């Protein structure tokens, strides 16, 4: 199984659009980090709790969008390459070829999501925290931007920020499952990239203009946003502003895990049927 995952990784590295995405994503991350540091002027204006409050907002500022961009560009061809390179018939020649290939692609997707979130999170915490010497990093968190700190066990500012990236990882898997399903259905990289990237942009736009919409539109769209991958990526599915939805943080986590498992199951069903066609 390990060598199959390594083979998927080699395929991934061979895709030209992936390296373009890495370059653009790296520039976007550097821009986001530079903007955060230059605008906040951590060392001069704010106390330690306020500085960590700003660090908490980095996911909203650039983390979620950068994660979605790297997933939307990096994953579709991984599913479509056998069809586009006309090697799909070879997968079915082995007794368990389809099943093993699906497992390898799913496992690589999980590892890819983990790597993307870890790099973004580590860079954000190291650069932003280092800008003020990690002052108050181990002090108890005083408040949360996205979800109520009272719903969580006592933790430090640094642990709270790290936990946010754990929730971002959950949102990344949620979005990745959607990408796998779309790519398996369309079997075309460009179309999948357009549909998946466009879906995230619609969710992102709703997060900005949603409250201004008429109620008959806002209610169903808000439910779709909050229970979909958009709300999970942008952390609003955990928001303390909506206690009537989530009185405890385990509820959105449990829903997210359930949706991810459902997506991976649907991906297997669609993948198997398409490979037989």
Question: Where are the model-predicted features located?
Answer:
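Residues that define the loop-to-transmembrane-helix transition and helix capping
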Residues: 99, 189-190
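Short helix-to-coil transition segments within interhelical loops
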Residues: 92-98
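Aromatic- and glycine-rich beta-strand/loop motifs that create alpha-glucan
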Residues: 1-25, 105
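Junction motif at the cytosolic side of a transmembrane helix
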Residues: 5-8, 181-185, 255-277
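Alpha-helical transmembrane segments
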Residues: 19-28, 115, 259, 263
């Amino acid at each position: 199984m390990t060598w199959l995952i390594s083979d998927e990784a080699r395929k991934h590295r061979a895709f030209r659009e992936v390296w373009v995405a890495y370059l653009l994503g790296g520039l976007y991350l550097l821009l986001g980090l530079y903007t955060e540091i230059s605008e906040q002027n951590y060392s001069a204006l704010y106390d330690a709790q306020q500085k960590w409050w700003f660090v908490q907002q980095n996911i909203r500022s650039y983390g979620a969008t950068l994660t979605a961009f790297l997933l939307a560009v990096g994953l579709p061809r991984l599913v479509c390459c056998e069809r586009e390179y006309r090697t799909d018939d070879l997968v079915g020649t082995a007794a368990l070829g389809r099943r093993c290939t699906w497992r390898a692609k799913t496992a690589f997707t999980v590892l890819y999501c983990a790597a993307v979130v870890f790099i973004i999170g580590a860079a954000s915490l190291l650069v932003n925290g280092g800008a003020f010497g990690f002052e108050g990093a181990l002090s108890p968190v005083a408040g949360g931007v996205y979800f109520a700190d009272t719903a969580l066990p006592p933790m430090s500012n640094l642990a709270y920020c790290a936990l946010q990236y754990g929730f971002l990882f959950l949102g990344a898997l949620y979005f990745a499952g959607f990408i796998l399903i779309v790519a398996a259905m369309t079997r075309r990289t460009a179309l999948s990239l357009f549909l998946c990237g466009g879906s995230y942009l619609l969710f992102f736009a709703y997060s900005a203009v949603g409250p201004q919409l008429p109620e008959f539109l806002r209610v169903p769209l808000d439910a779709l946003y909050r229970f979909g991958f958009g709300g999970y990526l942008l952390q609003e599915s955990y928001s303390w502003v909506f206690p009537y939805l989530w009185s405890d943080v385990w509820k959105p986590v449990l829903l997210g895990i359930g949706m991810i498992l459902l997506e991976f199951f649907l991906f297997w069903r669609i993948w198997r049927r398409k490979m037989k066609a």
